[in-house]
Amino acid sequence: MTQIHPTAIVSSTAEIHETASIGPYCIVGDNVSIGAGTKLLRHVVVTKNTRIGKNNEIFQFASIGEDCQDLKYNGEETWLEIGDNNSIREACSFHRGTIQDNSLTKIGSNNLFMVNTHIAHDCIVGDGNILANNVGVAGHVHIGNNVILGGNAGVHQFCQIGDYSLVGGGSVILKDVAAMTLVSGNPAQAHGLNIEGMRRKDWSKETINTLRTAYKLIFKSGKTTEEVIEELTQDFLPQEPKVQLLIDSLLSSKRGIIR
């Protein structure tokens, strides 16, 4: 039987799994679904049109599925989706999408969103990420998998942040972050590969050394992007599949790569 505290307010159109729990003073609005084992601890607001998966834990004063802050938004029916096994800490805010994009903000699984993280409209966040306290992510941003954003980092609209990258605390991201790179500063600049992150994932020395050489080709050779992609594809990719992450970053970038 679903555990719903007597002080909680839950819409009649909400679908709450029998193993989910809704704590004191929570508000769950229309067209919300909450999956098995998910916990809304206390004082959590899930406004509307939100699908939350399994085994998430959402802490007090989080605002989930609220109307976005885009001035073009005019009350259209848009959505927020959250995957499984996420920890969403105090005062986080996740907004629904806009019809100017895909009408959807999408959060993956196994992420940690620390206190006061903001995810704006139409963002796509992958799996296994850590966003530290007070990170602000503007609209239409795409964050890959296994990314770390340090506290108080800010990300400009439409930026992409590649897999396994590390953004230093307080950084301002104005362009795209290539996969596996370490960036920091205001505005952020690249400072090499996220070597420590690779070691924590138990990547081999051979893999890391190959990626180091690939990094130098991208950032220090002076060659055009087209030349770099061709060389990475022909000379690096056959010996190291993870080079594909760097190639994908270059191919998908619309704002240019942080250098």
Curated annotation (Swiss-Prot):
The record, for Gene3D superfamilies, names:
Hexapeptide repeat proteins, Udp N-acetylglucosamine O-acyltransferase, C-terminal domain
GO BP, sorted A to Z = lipid A biosynthetic process
Q: Please verify whether the record's keywords include Repeat.
A: yes
Q: Does the keyword Transmembrane apply?
A: no
Main localization (coarse): cytoplasm
Functionally, this protein is described as follows:
Involved in the biosynthesis of lipid A, a phosphorylated glycolipid that anchors the lipopolysaccharide to the outer membrane of the cell.
The protein, known as? Acyl-[acyl-carrier-protein]--UDP-N-acetylglucosamine O-acyltransferase
The source organism is: Psychrobacter sp. (strain PRwf-1)
